[in-house]
Amino acid sequence: MQKRIALSFPEEVLEHVFSFIQLDKDRNSVSLVCKSWYEIERWCRRKVFIGNCYAVSPATVIRRFPKVRSVELKGKPHFADFNLVPDGWGGYVYPWIEAMSSSYTWLEEIRLKRMVVTDDCLELIAKSFKNFKVLVLSSCEGFSTDGLAAIAATCRNLKELDLRESDVDDVSGHWLSHFPDTYTSLVSLNISCLASEVSFSALERLVTRCPNLKSLKLNRAVPLEKLATLLQRAPQLEELGTGGYTAEVRPDVYSGLSVALSGCKELRCLSGFWDAVPAYLPAVYSVCSRLTTLNLSYATVQSYDLVKLLCQCPKLQRLWVLDYIEDAGLEVLASTCKDLRELRVFPSEPFVMEPNVALTEQGLVSVSMGCPKLESVLYFCRQMTNAALITIARNRPNMTRFRLCIIEPKAPDYLTLEPLDIGFGAIVEHCKDLRRLSLSGLLTDKVFEYIGTYAKKMEMLSVAFAGDSDLGMHHVLSGCDSLRKLEIRDCPFGDKALLANASKLETMRSLWMSSCSVSFGACKLLGQKMPKLNVEVIDERGAPDSRPESCPVERVFIYRTVAGPRFDMPGFVWNMDQDSTMRFSRQIITTNGL
């Protein structure tokens, strides 16, 4: 019956219907209905997302989806953001660009995260894709402003250039001048990560001649005195990153900035504010009533000035801020911003032992009580209680992402000195739609039992300095049906939990473990047992076979793949496929023979 229904629609109709299906997992499900749907979906797929660049080869993707216009790739594991992945590990995008340059000549969008991108890559992109429109490089490295100059000079239809949090070699600040004088298509520009000055005259000319520019995020080197000039050239902006927000207090600078901002009637998102001078903050008040996003994570502004600013932002939906906001500021946020969906509070002094601000669990409790739409939290603090976590869970059962980072590892409930198991247990029990969870504080295996029992929709879990034994990890792997990414550091989890749940790993995207109790022997056995997994031992102490098999490895990264072992492994990475484990065995036999 299903086959007859599938065949009753012309291909053109099905292609049109499929175009409304946006989620990759839904597109994948559609392609499994029957052979004809598989072929139609294959030829009409325009966007591809690959969460691990080593999970599949470029050739396989190109063969599977010949008409792709947009590619999104991720490289290094998430823990690379915390310097836990050694330099030179991999994540090189050049093989992908090289393969796509000859097969996807009409490619329009490339979005990369945590990948190594060289100037050669950027030059090849500029040369190969004639209708190229979007380049997003998020937390990438390896390229310079010379590569950006090639993009600017050649990609005449470029709409978006986003370098968010990338490490760029600033060879020259004049790369913006490579955009041709006839170029007018820019919609979004993010250069906030650049350390050096850019040519302001080139930037001003670019902004002036792009009437559709909606998002402009400047770097710290753009002085506050010149911001008003750019705003006057682009009053249509919807998103602004201010760059440096410091200057000698002068009435003419303040009034010029205030007038320019008041002319930006469409502005909805503000960020930047490096080294913000409080005296200039009231200049933004005229746009605050419309703001939905405010990123103050670089603004070292004290609570008093933050409170005055937040009182002007009743429509705020997303706030990123340093812990200078303190509990008092979060109470004002809770009473003012009833539409708040996302809150991130970052530490101003993460390596200072004594607290430098009055930020506690009470601030988060206040927001959970006052903001009924809150669904995403990242909260750095120095103390927490089970009672507070239980209250937050009951107040906000709609939470989908909850990441709590208590700065001191293994910190207990500071009032009772008990583990925080019950508190996090309440989070996973009450928040039925929880997708992402990060744990911290003193935690036993009990919390992982709660997670395995209740967190049925959780897709990503981050764990550090937690648990008692393999049982904790076993609870998670055996109980969390939707788990896709698990990252663990400094926990006593080892061989038993890993090997007992080997089949679960084939349903996940990846597992990262560092400074745990996983042995080299278990990694070898897992690699032999599960050929669809790449089991990569990362050990900078030397070849793991030079030590007893019972010796724990420094790091292991396990991920599902249809491409087999990768070919760009550095000298400190070993793949535990069957061939490599046989080579290790022969080496051990030879060594013992000597």
Curated annotation (Swiss-Prot):
Region (Interaction with auxin-responsive proteins): 81-82, 347-352, 405-409, 464-465
Subcellular location field: Nucleus
Pfam families: F-box_5, Transp_inhibit
Knockout-associated phenotype: Plant are deficient in a variety of auxin-regulated growth processes including lateral root formation, and hypocotyl and cell elongation.
Leader sequence segment: none
Domain F-box: 3-50
GO biological process, one term: ethylene-activated signaling pathway
Amino acids binding 1D-myo-inositol hexakisphosphate: 74, 113-114, 344, 401-403, 436, 484-485, 509
Name this protein carries in UniProt: Protein TRANSPORT INHIBITOR RESPONSE 1
Gene this chain is encoded by: TIR1
